[in-house]
């Protein structure tokens, strides 16, 4: 009879319980606990990580457990250095777009669960999607993350594909959605191939928790209850031709140490099997919502530990983009932007139809902590010295998968991303920004131009910025 103890850890395996191996996680947690004050080991790990080659799951676990104050300070300092080296001061902007909250699953932490009779169910028509996208374009968004519950009857793959075509086809005034990322349930290789052919950017799927027994308790019914099928979804996505995948856990569902190690092992697995790790790692935390109370989840983590998790992920997986949601407050967002986060949402609505409707029904998936408009978030980022980026050039220029990662790991991606961020910010300032934000943005663009080291790239970027001011759009390196 097979059980967890029969499985042997193998990061290159295609079997969930081998590349996310329960016993290896337990052994790693014990090792980290035993070595959390081992100064020589931790200093060696920091020295290794400073070379930007990443760390193993076991090495990362030691840094997460470390409680020596001066070494913890060095962990945070190194995370900031690595973030700056790979991503500079650029922060990619996006917005979630909820298509439908119909769902057949029984996830006990999500208000969309099938037995919740208090939440109004809604699925957007293509005309309603058009209105949502126009509203998003009028804010200035260029990049969306599609969200939909799992319901084969109400939300079949054909509906998702039609919605993607609708979104890409809408050009309102100077607006355009240039990259559609998709966060939908685990599906088949063939369906991933169809999503690829539809032109999606990143396929995103949160594991929720890597602890198999706890996962099955949290997902008692519905297709998502199949742990292996869910955990192996990214393998099928990459087999279907999707180059960029995004992983994440919902911190607070389970012991954070366990899920942190599982997350690192998943990144190692993708690198071992496909030669390219996750394009993004998301770090959501459990939060209140309709029919859901955080009091039911005793493993919720503090802001301080959340910041540590972000810092160690940045050190251990230096190349990955990191995403934080509007679940987090302005204060938490400010801190983790320094430590590792490279993408945030702005002006987000987590309800179906929430952008076009002035008074949407109570269909939110979770409560939002940051209620600021996109313009307010952009202005805030500029005040902090960040460059808000609406760039989607890598996806449209074919710099995806291993091609993107090789450029990023070699430190060459900044030659594209830096000027592209400035040009897309200039577009935003011309078309959507308030006068106050426009003034801040022009000042930051002027400063950033002076720091472009390549004279040829600087000259081209300067010329393009002037042409954007004259009404031209969509320049990119």
Question: For the regions a protein language model found, what residue spans apply to each?
Answer:
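Radical SAM enzyme core and accessory elements
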Residues: 1-44, 48, 331-339, 348-477
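An N-cap/entry alpha-helix motif that binds or orients negatively charged groups
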Residues: 47, 51-91
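Canonical Radical SAM [4Fe-4S] cluster-binding loop centered on the CxxxCxxC motif
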Residues: 87-88, 92-128
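Generic structural signal for well-ordered alpha-helices
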Residues: 95, 133, 161-168, 192, ...
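Core AdoMet radical
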Residues: 114-131, 135-238, 243-253, 275-282, ...
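Conserved C-terminal portion of the radical SAM core fold
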Residues: 148, 202, 207, 228-292, ...
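Short glycine-enriched, charge-decorated loop/helix-capping segments at active-site entrances
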Residues: 218-224, 295-299, 363
């Amino acid at each position: 009879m097979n059980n967890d103890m029969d499985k042997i850890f193998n990061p290159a395996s295609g079997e969930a319980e081998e590349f996310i191996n329960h016993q290896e996680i337990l052994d790693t947690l014990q090792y980290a606990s035993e070595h959390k004050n081992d100064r020589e080991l931790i200093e060696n790990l920091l020295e290794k990580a400073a070379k930007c080659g990443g760390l193993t799951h076991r090495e990362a676990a030691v840094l997460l457990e470390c409680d020596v104050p001066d070494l913890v300070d060095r962990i945070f300092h190194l995370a900031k250095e690595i973030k700056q080296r790979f991503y500079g001061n650029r922060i990619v902007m996006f917005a979630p777009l909820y298509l439908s909250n119909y769902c057949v699953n029984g996830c006990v932490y999500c208000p969309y669960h099938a037995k919740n009779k208090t939440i109004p169910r809604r699925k957007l028509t293509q005309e309603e999607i058009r209105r949502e996208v126009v509203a998003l374009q009028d804010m200035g968004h260029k990049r969306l993350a599609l969200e939909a519950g799992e319901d084969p009857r109400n939300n079949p793959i054909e509906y998702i594909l039609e919605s993607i075509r609708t979104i890409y086809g809408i050009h309102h005034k100077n607006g355009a959605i240039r990259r559609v990322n998709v966060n939908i349930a685990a599906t088949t290789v063939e369906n991933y191939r169809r999503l690829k052919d539809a032109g999606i950017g990143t396929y995103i799927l949160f594991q929720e928790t890597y602890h198999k027994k706890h996962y099955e308790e949290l997902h008692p019914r519905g297709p998502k209850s199949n742990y292996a099928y869910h955990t192996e979804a990214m393998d099928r996505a990459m087999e279907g031709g999707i180059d960029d995948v995004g992983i994440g856990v919902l911190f607070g569902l389970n012991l954070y140490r366990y899920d942190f190690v599982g997350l690192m092992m998943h990144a190692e697995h993708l690198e071992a099997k496909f030669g390219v790790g996750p394009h993004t790692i998301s770090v959501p935390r459990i939060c209140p919502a309709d029919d859901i109370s955080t009091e039911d989840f005793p493993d919720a983590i503090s802001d301080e530990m959340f910041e540590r998790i972000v810092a160690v992920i940045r050190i251990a997986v230096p190349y990955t983009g990191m995403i934080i949601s509007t679940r987090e407050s302005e204060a938490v967002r400010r801190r983790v932007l320094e430590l590792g986060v490279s993408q945030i949402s702005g002006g987000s609505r987590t309800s179906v139809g929430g952008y076009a409707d002035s008074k949407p029904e109570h269909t939110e998936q979770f409560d939002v902590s940051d209620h600021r408009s996109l313009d307010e978030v952009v202005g805030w980022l500029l005040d902090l010295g960040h460059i808000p980026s609406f760039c989607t050039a890598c996806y449209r220029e074919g710099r995806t998968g291993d091609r993107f990662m090789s450029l990023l790991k070699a430190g060459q991606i900044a030659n594209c991303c830096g000027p592209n961020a400035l040009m897309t910010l200039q577009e935003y300032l011309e078309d959507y920004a308030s006068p106050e934000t426009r003034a801040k943005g022009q000042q930051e663009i002027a400063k950033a131009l002076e720091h472009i080291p390549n004279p040829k790239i600087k000259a081209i970027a300067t010329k393009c910025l002037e042409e954007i001011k004259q009404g031209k759009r969509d320049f990119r390196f």
